[in-house]
Amino acid sequence: MYGESLVKLMLALDVMDEKKAILIAKETSEYVDSIKIGYPLVLATGLNIIDKIKESTNKEVICDFKVADIPSTNEKIAELTLNHADGIICQGFVGSDSVSAILNVARAKNKKVIVVTEMSHPGATEYLQNVAEDMAKMADRLKVDGIVAPSTRPERLKEIKSIAKDAFVISPGVGAQGGNLSDVLNVLNENDYVIIGRAIYENENPKNAAKKYKIQM
Ligand code: O7E
């Protein structure tokens, strides 16, 4: 039914209205493997939106709070978030003690931790890019479940993925940010996810847009 590479599709559901979020999540769920919810939707509607999206789609929901604090605060954020979500995204630049605090909470709840390395926007080349390989090494050493690396720079995606070799990759940048899907699919495999937001939820027919991407994967 779908393409050869079988890379997974993660919908970035950054709308700010509960009804719209649930409608788009339901409409696209046939073509989506996982749903990423972040500050826009949670701040607009509350953490319970995670349970509502899970109930209405039966999909895994990953919470994207890019947590970046000292260990004890990270632990509190992870505890509250992982009472709802299947996984949590945190920043790697805060260091291994802060990431480990989240990992400890997640392991106790059998949930996933995904660490950001290099981000996809142009500004990521100013600071983050310089330490992205080191963060990928830390992710490998700590045995986190997944890492985030950019679809806007496929050569960097490849390099970072080769360092954190046991982690799955979730990669944003295809669609609105200009990343090229086929370049990215050359790097990713069946454990990895392409993250797409606006190119699906801002389309006048989100279901068709999700289908269009999924059949290429
Ligand atoms: O550009 P879009 O609309 O397809 O959405 C991309 C999503 O990925 C959006 O939620 C944004 O916040 C997120 N993202 C990036 O775009 N770049 C990054 O480097 C990292 C993320 C991200 O989600 O980090 C955690 C996966």
From Swiss-Prot:
<dbReference type="InterPro" id="IPR001754">
    <property type="entry name" value="OMPdeCOase_dom"/>
</dbReference>
<dbReference type="InterPro" id="IPR018089">
    <property type="entry name" value="OMPdecase_AS"/>
</dbReference>
<dbReference type="Pfam" id="PF00215">
    <property type="entry name" value="OMPdecase"/>
</dbReference>
<keyword id="KW-0210">Decarboxylase</keyword>
<dbReference type="InterPro" id="IPR011060">
    <property type="entry name" value="RibuloseP-bd_barrel"/>
</dbReference>
<protein>
    <recommendedName>
        <fullName>Orotidine 5'-phosphate decarboxylase</fullName>
        <ecNumber>4.1.1.23</ecNumber>
    </recommendedName>
</protein>
<comment type="function">
    <text>Catalyzes the decarboxylation of orotidine 5'-monophosphate (OMP) to uridine 5'-monophosphate (UMP).</text>
</comment>
<dbReference type="InterPro" id="IPR014732">
    <property type="entry name" value="OMPdecase"/>
</dbReference>
<comment type="pathway">
    <text>Pyrimidine metabolism; UMP biosynthesis via de novo pathway; UMP from orotate: step 2/2.</text>
</comment>
<feature type="binding site">
    <location>
        <position position="36"/>
    </location>
    <ligand>
        <name>substrate</name>
    </ligand>
</feature>
<feature type="active site" description="Proton donor">
    <location>
        <position position="66"/>
    </location>
</feature>
<dbReference type="GO" id="GO:0005829">
    <property type="term" value="C:cytosol"/>
</dbReference>
<dbReference type="GO" id="GO:0044205">
    <property type="term" value="P:'de novo' UMP biosynthetic process"/>
</dbReference>
<feature type="binding site">
    <location>
        <position position="14"/>
    </location>
    <ligand>
        <name>substrate</name>
    </ligand>
</feature>
<feature type="binding site">
    <location>
        <begin position="172"/>
        <end position="182"/>
    </location>
    <ligand>
        <name>substrate</name>
    </ligand>
</feature>
<feature type="binding site">
    <location>
        <position position="197"/>
    </location>
    <ligand>
        <name>substrate</name>
    </ligand>
</feature>
<dbReference type="InterPro" id="IPR013785">
    <property type="entry name" value="Aldolase_TIM"/>
</dbReference>
<comment type="subunit">
    <text>Homodimer.</text>
</comment>
<feature type="binding site">
    <location>
        <position position="198"/>
    </location>
    <ligand>
        <name>substrate</name>
    </ligand>
</feature>
<comment type="similarity">
    <text>Belongs to the OMP decarboxylase family. Type 1 subfamily.</text>
</comment>
<keyword id="KW-0665">Pyrimidine biosynthesis</keyword>
<keyword id="KW-0456">Lyase</keyword>
<feature type="binding site">
    <location>
        <begin position="64"/>
        <end position="73"/>
    </location>
    <ligand>
        <name>substrate</name>
    </ligand>
</feature>
<dbReference type="GO" id="GO:0004590">
    <property type="term" value="F:orotidine-5'-phosphate decarboxylase activity"/>
</dbReference>
<dbReference type="GO" id="GO:0006207">
    <property type="term" value="P:'de novo' pyrimidine nucleobase biosynthetic process"/>
</dbReference>
<feature type="binding site">
    <location>
        <position position="120"/>
    </location>
    <ligand>
        <name>substrate</name>
    </ligand>
</feature>
<dbReference type="InterPro" id="IPR047595">
    <property type="entry name" value="OMPdecase_arc"/>
</dbReference>
